[in-house]
Curated annotation (Swiss-Prot):
InterPro entries tied to this protein: AAA+_ATPase (IPR003593), ABC_carbohydrate_import_ATPase (IPR050107), ABC_transporter-like_ATP-bd (IPR003439), ABC_transporter-like_CS (IPR017871), P-loop_NTPase (IPR027417)
Family: Belongs to the ABC transporter superfamily. Arabinose importer (TC 3.A.1.2.2) family.
CDD domains hit by this protein: ABC_Carb_Monos_I, ABC_Carb_Monos_II
PROSITE patterns in UniProt: ABC_TRANSPORTER_1 (PS00211), ABC_TRANSPORTER_2 (PS50893), ARAG (PS51268)
Protein name: Arabinose import ATP-binding protein AraG
Gene giving rise to this polypeptide: araG
PANTHER family: ARABINOSE IMPORT ATP-BINDING PROTEIN ARAG, CARBOHYDRATE TRANSPORT ATP-BINDING PROTEIN MG119-RELATED
Role of this protein: Part of the ABC transporter complex AraFGH involved in arabinose import. Responsible for energy coupling to the transport system.
Signal peptide positions on this chain: none
Keywords associated with the record: ATP-binding, Cell inner membrane, Cell membrane, Membrane, Nucleotide-binding, Repeat, Sugar transport, Translocase, Transport
E.C. no: 7.5.2.12
Length: 504
């Protein structure tokens, strides 16, 4: 039952940056003992609101009210001391320090300037036990798995008696087992009467955890759902994108041309058995498989990121020798990698540079001078055509949302003479509206005759977008399914390891 008095309230919150209005008049309430989800497309304002709550940003207008008192935090330390903790996607811990030191960093127990190690490890052990974690507090953090790092971050919040704990995309790097453990902890924190804010694009997580959902769009409050029995996927999507998008995938049958890409008994590092497949001009082929199936390893090998150890790659019936990415690009084969931030973009460069970096060599003046006129026009053209949301072409790409970063990478390859595009988890961590836009780009590329090979662990996405689905299992092809005939049961049956099938 919802309490009558909210523990946390946002009142008319607005935030303006130079040239950008990030938040406008955000007002809603959160209650103790509830998980309150925040949803919206990338750039909707969720992370900005959390940064205001945590003291990273000061609001331009409005106020934050905690337990009836209007609060203003000068920095994150002030917020943490007031009982507000944010568990970010990129964890703020020190790998070289011990678990206990990370938990009590800034408030280490000491006497006469000397840290009381015995008391430190004892207190840290109590916090870890509270979370059900069997970890030696004296262990250096660097030796723990990422899921355990997250538990240390939560223990750090509890050590400061945090009453408000916000999670920002917490499961993006976790295994299924680690996600289950995180959910167990969040439910325990809810039982203890804490306010839990939860930001995620994964609707299955939202429905599994939430007592209330607030939706943002374009920096504005849209709606708060409080009756979880009456809200469904379609209602959330409509609130997030401002329209009923119906079938988000929008697949339609199309005709294909001649064979454009062929793999003849190709092996790459991490791919156990030779892979043979073909993709025709204008065809979209989806690669599906469970973790460890070899999808990403095959993609990296085809692009020259890792070594092809056997077999032959053909483009337009011509054998291609790919030993590094420049060989693939020269042959007309491009890659949007799974690790978008680490391998797909240059974070400290502008959107303009990230779009132009590959094709600029073809447009230099006198063989050595950058053609600024071409670069400006090319970047602006792709920003407009791909609907990249940015204050301008000179904005650092690291400041863009994941969906807009992905569209900038696509813009880079649209600047080249593309025959084949390899897409590895192209919509991971991207909101539903941006996914729809990226699917439309994929369809447009296919309509232009590009052969599309994309790998995804999102089975509904593969079934919804691909003309043909190639299922991989333990580094080999387990089977193929046509779009019109494929369903989740068939695909999962093919993808499951043989041992599991035998046990079943």
């Amino acid at each position: 039952m919802q309490q009558s008095t909210p523990y946390l309230s946002f009142r008319g919150i607005g935030k303006t940056f130079p040239g950008v209005k990030a938040l406008t008049d955000i007002s809603f309430d959160c209650y103790a003992g509830q998980v309150h989800a925040l949803m919206g497309e990338n750039g909707a304002g969720k992370s900005t609101l959390l940064k205001i709550l945590s003291g990273n940003y000061a609001p331009t207008t409005g106020s934050v009210v905690i337990n009836g008192q209007e609060m203003s935090f000068s920095d994150t330390t002030a917020a943490l001391n007031a009982g507000v903790a944010i568990i970010y996607q990129e964890l703020h811990l020190v790998p070289e320090m011990t678990v206990a030191e990370n938990i009590y960093l800034g408030q280490l127990p000491h006497k006469g300037g000397i840290v009381n190690r015995s008391l430190l490890n004892y207190e840290a052990g109590l916090q870890l036990k509270h979370l059900g974690m069997d970890i030696d507090p004296d262990t250096p953090l660097k030796y723990l798995a990422i899921g355990q790092w997250q538990m240390v971050e939560i223990a750090k919040a509890l050590a400061r008696n945090a009453k408000i704990i916000a999670f920002d995309e917490p499961t993006s790097s976790l295994s299924a087992r680690e996600i289950g453990n995180l959910f167990r902890v969040i439910r325990e924190l809810r039982k203890e009467g804490r306010v839990i804010l939860y930001v995620s694009h994964r609707m299955e997580e939202i429905f599994a955890l939430s007592d209330a959902i607030t939706v943002f769009k374009d920096g504005r409050y849209v709606k708060t759902f409080t009756d979880m029995q009456q809200v469904d996927h379609d209602a959330l999507v409509q609130a997030m994108v401002g329209r009923d998008i119906g079938d988000i995938y929008g697949w339609q049958p199309r005709s294909y041309g001649e064979e454009r890409l062929r793999l003849d008994a190709v092996k790459a590092l991490g791919v156990r058995t030779p892979i043979s497949l073909a993709v025709r001009s204008g065809e979209i082929v989806g690669l599906f498989g469970l973790v460890g199936a070899g999808r990403s390893e095959l993609m990296k090998g085809l692009f020259g990121g890792t070594q092809i150890t056997a077999g032959q790659v053909y483009i337009d019936q011509q054998p291609i020798d790919i030993r590094k990415p420049s060989h693939a690009i020269a042959a007309g084969m491009m890659l949007c990698p799974e690790a978008r931030k680490a391998e797909g973009i240059i974070p400290v460069h502008s959107v303009r540079d990230n779009i132009n970096i590959s094709a600029r060599r073809k447009h230099v003046l006198g063989g050595c001078v950058i053609n600024n006129s071409w670069e400006e026009n090319n970047a602006d053209q792709h920003i407009r055509s791909l609907n990249i949301k940015t204050p301008g072409a000179e904005q650092l790409i690291m400041n863009l949302s994941g969906g807009n970063q992905q569209k900038a990478i696509l813009g880079r390859w649209l600047s080249e003479e593309m025959k084949v595009i390899l897409l590895d988890e192209p919509t991971r961590g991207i909101d539903v509206g941006a996914k729809h836009e990226i699917y439309n780009v994929i369809y447009a590329l296919a309509a232009q005759g590009v052969a599309v090979l994309f790998a995804s662990s999102d089975l509904p996405e593969v079934l919804g977008v691909a003309d043909r689905i190639v299922v991989m299992r333990e580094g080999e092809i387990a089977g193929e399914l046509l779009h019109e005939q494929a369903d989740e049961r068939q695909a999962l049956s093919l993808a499951m390891p043989k041992v599991s099938q035998a046990v079943a």
